[in-house]
Amino acid sequence: MHQFTSTGKLDFETVIKSLDYLEQVTKETLRLYPPGLTFVTRQAKDDFAYKGTQFKAGTCFMVPLYQIQRDPRFWPEPLQFNPGRFAPENDAELIKAAYMPFGVGPRNCVGKSMAMLKLKLAMAKLVLKYRLELGPSQMGQMDINSRAMVSTPARGPWIIIRHISNRL
């Protein structure tokens, strides 16, 4: 990260064009911990049948984002944190509809690009000045509060933050 800035300040161009791995880390984090656990909903416009089951027009469907984004049919080793899944050379292997932290298709979140920019900018600024470590309660698999509508750690987001004093 420090190779991209000598002043400790990040500009738009750096965040957008130079931090490819940060983009991959952001996408993988959103795959494992989507902000909304079931916010993608759709309503049937017409009656239809799927695998022998009839659905009437107006039926509402909620997409289980958390489960789909961890499904081994779509993601090899789905619980493994692997930012390389989103490397450009792996793009052809991705099943685009299985990744939807901002929804999918023509009705996806209109703020997706802005949210990604803000997430990357915040993470870049954090890692420039701080070292982040998991607290003792967060070692291993992070459990999500199953009653929450948004991704919320079950045992609190305990993080140890250490200022990097010898830099900037």
Residue positions per predicted region:
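Conserved, non-catalytic sequence blocks in retroelement Pol enzymes and Pol-derived host proteins
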Residues: 12-20, 109-113, 149-151
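Conserved cytochrome P450 K-helix/beta-meander segment immediately N-terminal to the heme-binding cysteine loop
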Residues: 16, 33, 49, 63-90
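Conserved cytochrome P450 K-helix E-x-x-R motif and the immediately C-terminal K′/meander segment
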Residues: 8-51, 165-167
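Hydrophobic, well-ordered secondary-structure elements that form the walls
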Residues: 29, 55-58, 81, 105, ...
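Cytochrome P450 heme-binding "Cys pocket" and the immediately downstream C-terminal segment
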Residues: 113-150
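Juxtamembrane membrane-interface segments of multi-pass membrane proteins
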Residues: 1-7
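Cytochrome P450 heme-thiolate "Cys pocket" and heme-binding signature region
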Residues: 88-119, 143-147
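C-terminal helix/juxtamembrane-tail motif
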Residues: 60, 150-168
